Structure formats: C-alpha cells, structure tokens
Swiss-Prot record:
The keyword Secreted is annotated on this UniProt entry: yes
Keyword match Nuclease: no
Source organism: Bothrops jararaca (Jararaca)
Name of this chain's protein: Thrombin-like enzyme TL-BJ 1
Main subcellular location of this protein, as a coarse class: secreted
Any one of the GO CC terms: extracellular region
Summary of activators and inhibitors of this protein: Inhibited by PMSF, but not by hirudin.
Length: 19
C-alpha cells in the first residue's frame, strides 16, 4: 500500500476481499 494511510489500507482490504 503506497503511503500507508489507514484509509488506503481499508480500501486495499476491500479489494483483497474481492480478489
């Protein structure tokens, strides 16, 4: 995750669930 922002991580988790 670029930046390491909590919001960014949260979005990344959603994408991970989709994949």
């Amino acid at each position: 995750v670029i930046g390491g922002d909590e919001c960014n991580i949260n979005e990344h988790r959603s994408l991970a669930l989709v994949y």
